[in-house]
């Protein structure tokens, strides 16, 4: 339960603290990025702005995953899997997620 609350707080912080030229919400709604079950964002469009956003977000996520794992005495893989499940589950209709078969699908 504690892990879940910490993870939810982390995920909310990622979205709200991201002040970049291209925001994560914009990239999601424009179909430029997609969420994966392994907890990281993937660029679906290969322009420099999208790739920079993805690299920055993923670096923040990696650091947060490592910190959460250490605080909760669990493996980083456990945190990554939980984060991935939650990120895919909370994706809004029209946003891209990677299915368990590896194919990109638009949520509806």
Protein language model features and the residues they cover:
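N-terminal hydrophobic targeting signals that begin at the initiator methionine
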Residues: 1-2
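Sec-dependent N-terminal signal peptides
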Residues: 5-13
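Sec/Tat signal peptide C-region and signal peptidase I cleavage site
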Residues: 16-21
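Amphipathic, charged alpha-helical segments and their helix-to-coil junctions
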Residues: 22-56, 76-108
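Short, well-ordered alpha-helical segments
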Residues: 53-69
């Amino acid at each position: 339960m504690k892990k879940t609350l910490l993870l939810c707080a982390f995920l909310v912080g990622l979205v709200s603290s991201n002040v970049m030229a291209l925001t994560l919400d914009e990239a999601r709604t424009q179909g430029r990025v997609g969420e994966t079950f392994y907890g990281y964002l993937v660029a679906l469009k290969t322009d420099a702005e999208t790739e920079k956003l993805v690299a920055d977000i993923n670096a923040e996520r990696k650091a947060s995953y490592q910190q959460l794992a250490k605080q909760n005495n669990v493996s980083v893989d456990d945190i990554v899997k939980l984060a991935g499940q939650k990120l895919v589950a909370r994706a809004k209709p029209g946003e891209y997620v990677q299915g368990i078969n590896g194919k990109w699908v638009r949520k509806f």
